A protein has these predicted regions:
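Histidine-dependent nucleotide/RNA phosphoesterase domain, centered on the 2H-phosphoesterase fold
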Residues: 1-140
Length: 140
């Protein structure tokens, strides 16, 4: 596992102040961890090299990030926004995984799971915590 850090961000906007997605959904009840953009660039570069430069990745809309809460309305909304903007450490497995063109790395972080519990959500999210670095679905 490799240690890194990011910043907690509640209800992340898709564009300047916009929370509505193209499919009509919302990012209102989302909690992500913004990760270092350079980490994302580096990991996408390693992916491209591993694929012998035959595949590239498009960066995620939010940049490299960990989705801690994905649209689950918390049971205890009073705790929503707790520690917004705070730094948080996490460990990630350096072996990339790919699902439906999305490339990600498994993450371990007890503090993120503690936040889920404080909000009245199941400790373990589904899918499990992971660092998203890009997708190969829409690249040329």
């Amino acid at each position: 596992m490799i240690r890194s850090f990011g910043t907690l961000r509640y209800s992340p906007a898709l564009r300047a102040g916009v929370h509505t997605r193209r499919d009509g959904g919302t990012t209102r009840w989302w909690l992500i961890v913004d990760c270092d953009p350079e980490l994302g660039r580096y990991l996408r570069h390693l992916y491209t090299i591993a694929k012998r430069r035959t595949r590239t990745l498009q960066a995620p809309l939010w940049g490299p990030h960990i989705s801690v809460i994905r649209g689950e309305e918390p049971h205890d909304v009073r705790a929503w926004g707790e520690h917004d903007g705070a730094a948080i450490e996490f460990d990630y497995d350096p072996n990339a995984r790919e699902t439906d063109g999305y490339v990600w790395y498994p993450v371990e972080c007890a503090a993120m799971l503690d936040l889920r519990e404080r909000l009245g959500l199941a400790r373990e999210p589904s899918p499990a915590l992971h660092l998203t670095i890009g997708n190969a679905r829409y690249t040329r």
